[in-house]
Amino acid sequence: MKETIDFLIDTIEARQVLDSRGNPTVEAEVFLECGAIGRAIVPSGASTGAHEAHELRDGGTKYMGKGVLNAVNKIHETISPALCGLSALDQTSIDNLMIEIDGTPNKSSLGANSILAVSLANARAASNALDLPLYRYLGDPLSNLLPVPLMNVINGGAHAPNGLDCQEFMLVPHGVKTFSEALRIGTEIFHSLKSLLEKKGLSTAVGDEGGFAPELSSSEAAGDLLLEAIQKAGFIPGEQVSLALDVASTEFYKDGFYKYEGKSLTSSQMISYLSNLVSNYPIVSIEDGLAEDDWEGWSALNKEIGNKVQLVGDDLFVTNTERLRKGILEKSANSILIKVNQIGTLTETLEAMDLAKSAGFTSVISHRSGETEDTTIADLSVATRAGQIKTGSLSRSERIAKYNRLLRIEEELGDQARFAGDLGLGPKNI
């Protein structure tokens, strides 16, 4: 075993790099006394919840105001001096110290992007110092469960400039025995879908998350396309592969109504609409079916269809334990989307997942629409045995990087590797 001093933080560096949308983001590097290095890059969302932790942006004219040099300076001038000399193995203390220094409810002083970059880079440095893969360092010897991928193959809403209000239409290959087999099935359907779109004269241009962004008139039209693509690829909808939606309802919720597909719907009407979709399509998961502060509506939605499908709170919970506790108390959902940059530290992310599990909720580890080559969430999904991961479509290398990392983990685990499959989905299979 190395001496304790070997795990002490020596220096922390940071820089401004670009994400998959060409927008600036923060990269941090944590250097330990033993020579180990950890590097992490934070992602950024397009449809962001009002209650998310605060991203620090520069404003001004450079990069259309989206620069992050101020966040980089916060790391160099404030975070690094405070953390140098501390043990990288004490992740909780490091994260809590950054939260304390920030001193705001939403991390608006130091910025969640600067805090998270250091938090994740520190975990990487510690795992490298111990010569452990990140999933093993963050997890335990039983961390061998590969997640079911929720693959966003048709993009709409804030992720694509087409006529679809629903933001994501996803494939969920669950009825197989291995992650690699699930990935193969999803990939084959993705290419089947592309051929279908070409034959119908529809665009095969892709959106932010690598899914296609055709001009379609309704969610039903997208659902029908996916069913046809699944069957043409030789699979059975609802058996090997099901569907999932991210409605991102907050994006079109105005003045108490859901402005959806040319209609103005009440909360009750939106619930009826979603219930009909579940009856007509093999949907196993719906994310953000209602707006982030429509708490009464969420409880009604959960009562209506929560025993049939997974109801995932993204903007509703923003990976925040306070909002999650309220959701548990009010029975507002049965699942939480986990985005590390919504809350801003690894420790708080893990706390949210623990709370969700204690309440019988599922957790879905998720990317953001503005992603990078960083693969931390792949390791996190295995470390926590989450059972599900959202990391985009089967194109764009920032999405594929996570899938490839999971393939390597599966190979590394060998005979010990398990695939979540049907048991990874909620609520009826929890």
Curated annotation (Swiss-Prot):
Record: residues binding (2R)-2-phosphoglycerate = Q167, K339, R368, S369, K390
Cofactor comment: Binds a second Mg(2+) ion via substrate during catalysis.
Pfam families assigned to the protein according to its UniProt record, in alphabetical order? Enolase_C, Enolase_N
Keywords of the record, alphabetical order, are: Cytoplasm, Glycolysis, Lyase, Magnesium, Metal-binding, Secreted
Tell me the cofactors it needs. Mg(2+)
Question: Entry's InterPro entries?
Answer: Enolase, Enolase-like_C_sf, Enolase-like_N, Enolase_C, Enolase_CS, Enolase_N
* Active-site annotation: E209, K339
Could you tell me which PROSITE patterns the record lists for this protein?
A: ENOLASE
**Reactions catalysed according to its record:** (2R)-2-phosphoglycerate = phosphoenolpyruvate + H2O
Could you say which protein family the record assigns here?
A: Belongs to the enolase family.
Q: Which HAMAP family match?
A: Enolase (MF_00318)
Explain the purpose of this protein. Answer: Catalyzes the reversible conversion of 2-phosphoglycerate (2-PG) into phosphoenolpyruvate (PEP). It is essential for the degradation of carbohydrates via glycolysis.
Spell out the protein name for this chain: Enolase
Q: What organism, scientifically named, is this protein from? A: Prochlorococcus marinus subsp. pastoris (strain CCMP1986 / NIES-2087 / MED4)
